[in-house]
Amino acid sequence: GIAVRSTLIAGFPGETEADFAAARDLVTSYRFERLGVFPYSQEEGTPAFDMPGQVPQKVAEARVAELMELQRGVMRAFHRSLVGRTLPVLVDGYDADAKRVVGRTWADAPEVDGRVLLPKGCAEPGQMVDVTITQAHDYEVEGELAAVEPAVKGKAKKQA
C-alpha cells in the first residue's frame, strides 16, 4: 500500500484568511492519509522573524485546531475503509495502560501516528503479523491476528 503524508504550518507571516481557506480546502479535498499541522513559531534569527504580517499566536493555534478537526474526519473515513482488510503490521510492543499489544502498518510512523491495537499476548515486538482490521477509531484501529512471522530480535522497544 501507499500512504501520502504531509505537514502544514498555520499562521506563517503574511498568511491571510484566503490562504487559510485554501489550506482547509486542501485538507478536505486531498484527504492525506497522514497529516501533521503545527502553528508557526516566531524564532529569533530566522528570516521569517522580522517578516511583516505576523499572525497572532492565538489565531495560528485556532487555525491548527480547525485543520486538525478536518483531518480527524479524513482519518476516521480512512480507518473505516480498512475494516475487514488484512494488513501487515509490525509489532512495536505492549501498552500497559491499554493492556494491548501495539503495532503499526506501512502507513504509520513510530511515535507520531496512530497504532494498531491487538489482543494481549498475541505477538512479540519485532514480529510482522497479518492483522484483520475489526474496528476503526479516529487515530487508531483494532484488529485480530491472521498470521505471524518470527520476531526480529532487538528491533523494537516496549512502550509504557
Where are these regions (language model features)?
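Conserved C-terminal portion of the radical SAM core fold
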Residues: 1-46, 66-77
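Terminal RNA-binding accessory module
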Residues: 50-160
